[in-house]
Each structure stands twice: as C-alpha cells, then as structure tokens.
Amino acid sequence: MKFFMNSEEFARRLCSWQREKGRQNLPWFTSDPYRRWLSEIMLQQTQVSVVRDYFARFLQAFPTVDDLAEASEEDVMRLWAGLGYYSRARNLHKAAKEIASAGRFPQTRAAWEKLPGVGSSTAAALASFCNGEVAAVCDGNVKRVLARIFALSAPINQSKTAKLLQQRAEALVSRTDPGCYNQAMMDLGAMLCTRTTPKCEQCPVGEFCKASRQGNPLDYPVKAPAKPRKTALVHALLCVEIKEEEPWVWLVLRDEVQKGMGHWKGLWTLPETAHPRGVEVARIEHVMSHVTLTLAVHRAEVSELPPKAFAVPASRLTGGPLPAPIKKLLSTLLFDAQLF
C-alpha cells in the first residue's frame, strides 16, 4: 500500500503542513534544551493551554537548569502545585541535579532516557528536537494518528500493539528533519486528527490514511476496556486557630506514599487519621490517574494532630505547595464562620 512505500512523501507533506499551519507560537519552540526538556515533562498527560502559565512561572523562578537544581524541593513543588501528576515535579528536580552535575544536557536518545521522569517517547522528542537524532515520538496523539492511518483493529492499550505502533512510527519518521516531523505528528493529533471530531478534509496526509478512505475514522483507535479505578477513603483533620485576627490552618508535609496518595508526596496536606472523632465538615471526591480518592474532613483540636503538624496563615495558602483540591477546599471552608 502507498503508506508503506512512500514514507518520504508522507514526511514531506507533514513537515510542509507543520511549517505553514502547525503550532508555531509556543514559548518552548526553541533550540534551548532546558526549555524543551521542561516543556516536555510538563506536557506529559497535560494540555498545552494548562502548561503555558506554569511554564512561564517556572522560567521566571528558575531561568536555568542550575537554578532549578539548586532550588529546594518545597519551592519546586509549590510552583508545580495544581498541575497534577506530582511525581513529574520530583523527577524534574532530580534530573536537574543530574544535568547540572554533568555540566551539559544529554546528547542522545539513550542518554535522555536515563534521566528520571523521561520515558521512551519523551526521550525521542528531546533527542530529535535538541540533537537532531532520528527518533520517533509515539505519544497519545501520535498513536491515535497511526491507528487511523493503518486502521489498526488491535487495541492500542495493549503492549503488543504499542510495540507495533512504535515500529510503524520509527519507519515513517523523517530522516532529514525528525524534529519537524515529530512536531507535525503531535500537531496533527492535537489540531486535526482529534479524538471526537477529526477534520479529515483538512489533513495533509489524508490520502495515506486507511480509516479516512474507509470513511470511519471514529472507529479508531480501538481500546480494550480499562481496569476499574481503585478507590480510597481518607479521613483528614481540619484544625484552625485564630491568631492576630487571621485564621491559621494546621497542615503536614506529605513525605511518604500512603493510601494511593503518592502523587501528593512533597506537598502540604491536611493531617490524616484512621479514627476520626470530630464532626465531619466536608467531603470531596478527587479522581487521580490510579485511584478515586474520597476525602472526609473532620473538625479537630491541636491535641489530636501528629507531632510534625505545623500552622500556616491563610494568607500563605494561595502560594503554598498544596494540591489543587485541598487548596480549593480550604478556600471554601475558611469563609464559613460557623465552623469556628
């Protein structure tokens, strides 16, 4: 079939489209490996529209990789708070220290992949963007594009199919401009070959696409049923004191993985208890990638708190390293004068 025989034409059309109509105004479109690496980590599982502001704040706080390496974990987590998938921030900090110690950024895909938090697809992106290495990105957008081009009937969330997609991606990637090609594939998935409303009539490689020719692009990609998400119920303690006419909230620094809340390691959270005694004042549900967390919040006295608890004035909560659902919860509860 044509899409097997003419990969050069496929890549040429993609890159031509990307240069003319792709996303050109993103702040990390530069040869600076620090910006590229920072953006690729932030873009894992997160949309461009969300990443923009966080990216700008990180660059303002940590203009270079050395600045990031020298920062405290608390400062890194504080700036990351709200972006989610918090292990990314911890790995980012660890990787910054490794890069700073080495005195340079990785020069190959294999070297990129050795950094904490850098998987195969991210390493391919960075190697192609920063080093010009012929390496194919195969992230979620690219997998969807390839599944439609080849009309793959096998579920893409199975390991065998993932390997096949990676092989197809490596076969198609441009040998002359792999960075442009990878960006084009990601842009195509984000802008035209979207999950629910593919714009096949605008696609620069539509004639190569089997699903488009069949007239059924929405039938692809095929996915096997996902495993049910685990659930966890956590009882948290809310203790508020009034000092100098300002409420102070007692918090703890999460320093361990517990009850499926590993994503919050390194952040400020409410103290927890296995045996709540106070009145329940709030209950929230928060869906994470691996677990649906129900947080039951109980009023408590200082004497009930763990030894490592500390009090923070309400005015510091906005800029503190709190998970987004905890920050939102506290902003609501602290305005309820009937609680205190």
Task: Locate predicted features.
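Intrinsically disordered, low-complexity, charged terminal extensions of DNA damage-control enzymes
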Residues: M1-Q24, F29, D187-F340
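Catalytic cores of DNA base-excision repair glycosylases
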Residues: F4-E8, S16-E201, V205-Q214, L218
